[in-house]
Amino acid sequence: MITRRLALLCSTAVLAGASSALAQTRRTPVAPPHPAASRPRREAAPTGSPADTPLGPVDTAARWAYIQDFDTGASLLEKGADEEVPPSSMTKLMTMYIVYERLKQGRMKLEDELPVTERAWRMGGSKMFVQVGSTVKVEDLIRGVIVQSGNDACIVFAEAISGSEEQFAELMNEKAKQIGLVHTHFRNSTGWPDPEQKMSVRDIATLAGRIIRDHPEFYHYDSETSFKYNGIDQANRNPMVQKGTADGLKTGHTDAGGYGLVASAIRNGRRIILVLNGMASMRERAEESERLMDWAFANFEDVTLFTAGDIIERVPVWLGTAPTVPLVSGRSLMVTMPRNWRQRASVKVAFATPVKAPVAKGDVLGKLTLAGQGVPAMEVPLLAGADVPKLGLPGRAMAVLSHYVPGS
């Protein structure tokens, strides 16, 4: 077994003797696409225990926090990420996920009119102000939920889809299991206070990511800054959407859970999902979400170590029709790294040599390992990039003879 270390040079990682470049990185200077990004840098607001990050502890005013890279799924910051806590109006993400799924399946249309019951009309909290006995277009209800955080609009959807909000909550729980939410339980469609209504901030981030990934054709509603219905114009409650520093998703507040927010932003082609909960005020929520979103973009980058089919090394073949076989990656590999990752990362390839013919394209011949402080540890199989048939009998005889006879 031979093990070789990759040398990480500039924007590529090159194995001595290898011909292909590895590790092309996004090197564009990170800058938010909005003038608000030029605001003075905020210092951390230390409150309680700090959050865990690959770079070490980071203070945050949030009681619960989770930040994730959308493309790689890498966890950039965690604080109580799996604790089951009141999700407040961030619950509405699941209501909308189910609505979007119905629309995509053709079981509901944007122009459909849904009836408003007295229960929906009487619902307290944040409202779209639908009128009892009327009907409302699905598209208006979507904006009523996302922009205005309308509890009444959620009830209209729940009753239209499942007959009652109680039955709709059962559907929400089924969907939560299907998409991998493990610290979530729903009792209603709105996030109205209920001691059994729980979500972890990691689950909220997962749900937000599924909305963006599974239903991109509907995600544009999240970036709308206001919506007027029934003569009442209401602004989007998400402070980051209002400032143009995020393109979604939802805020929330309950007495038990405090002020929360799930937001997503894309800068220079890289998307981050941030979830904070348990803050003391709207102002603290706005400032902390901006600060930590900036921190995530400033301190990490997405690095493509290699793409599918890249030749990592050439391995000698014994008794084959070709002297070597290319060792290739079976898939593209992009990871999220600290920005000084070249000083932290250790990348090695290991393979047995020589390989005995015949070799079939796709055979696993070695592995690549990635490790280092703050670097996600992983192991990737390396595959034969071509078929190498076995030599015929005369060829094998000559190869054996040349191997054992000096000077031949």
Predicted regions and their residues:
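N-terminal secretory signal peptides and thylakoid transit peptides that target proteins
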Residues: 1-12
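Hydrophobic core
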Residues: 14-16, 368
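Domain-terminus/edge residues, biased toward the C-terminal soluble/receptor-binding domains
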Residues: 182-185, 193-408
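Boundary at the C-terminal end of the N-terminal hydrophobic targeting segment
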Residues: 21-23
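Active-site-adjacent loops and short helices of periplasmic peptidoglycan-processing enzymes
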Residues: 25-202, 208-214, 227
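Catalytic-site microenvironment of enzymes
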Residues: 6, 76, 407-408
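Phosphate-coordinating loops and pocket residues in cytosolic domains that bind phosphorylated ligands
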Residues: 9-10, 143, 223
